[in-house]
Amino acid sequence: AFIQTFEKVMPAMMGAYITKSDEELKFVKVTDKTSYQVAENSKEVAEKMKLSSHKNLEKILNKGIEEGESIQDVTKEILNGGIRDERYRARTVALTEMLRVHSYVANEAMMQCAVVEQKEWIHTGSTKNQPRENHVAMNGVTVNKNEPFELIGADGNTYLPMFPRDFCLPASECANCHCLHRAIVSESALGIAPEERRRMQSEYIENADREWEKELDMINYQKAVDY
């Protein structure tokens, strides 16, 4: 499953993001909430694309992430696999989902690093793509790492994503979005002893998992009530 591949490659992917901000930290684990969200999204994407089985898309995206394949390679496999006949649509799915995984990994790393205090939205639209004016306007916007950005959607609605391509955003704000978000390190926080920074990382993970357990119980309860 997609989540299994996500967990398999996480040490290398997330480790790189963590050490970029704090060389004293290493990958420990991904929080349960992030794992859950990525797994659920794999199914949702397949449903939106009206595929016969989400496992087909999972298999191709899994391979792309594990082997570091380019967007072009993943697109070709999606097309050759008969999942979607239209090239643009297939490329959009491959690109968006691979970048979305990296966004979640990057954000997870920021949250686990005590030296990271803020994050910045970076617009990196290609000249080959028609840039979204509302995303261009976000370039350089900085917020505290545990707070959402405020994005005015093309539909006029206000969204509060933690980063580009967050699951809370509609497809119209995610498809072919090349935006990134980067960590802003506090120089003063670098003065915290390495062992204390590692303790803070472990504490964050434990607290995040504990809070997610409560949140998941509420989600499951609501599903049972609605059913």
Regions found by a protein language model. Give the residues of each.
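Extended, regular secondary-structure scaffolds
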Residues: 73-75, 89-93, 165
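Activation/maturation switch segments at domain boundaries
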Residues: 1, 96-227
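A short structural micro-motif
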Residues: 80-85, 96, 100
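N-terminal leader/targeting and assembly helices and adjacent pre-domain segments
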Residues: 1-84, 184-227
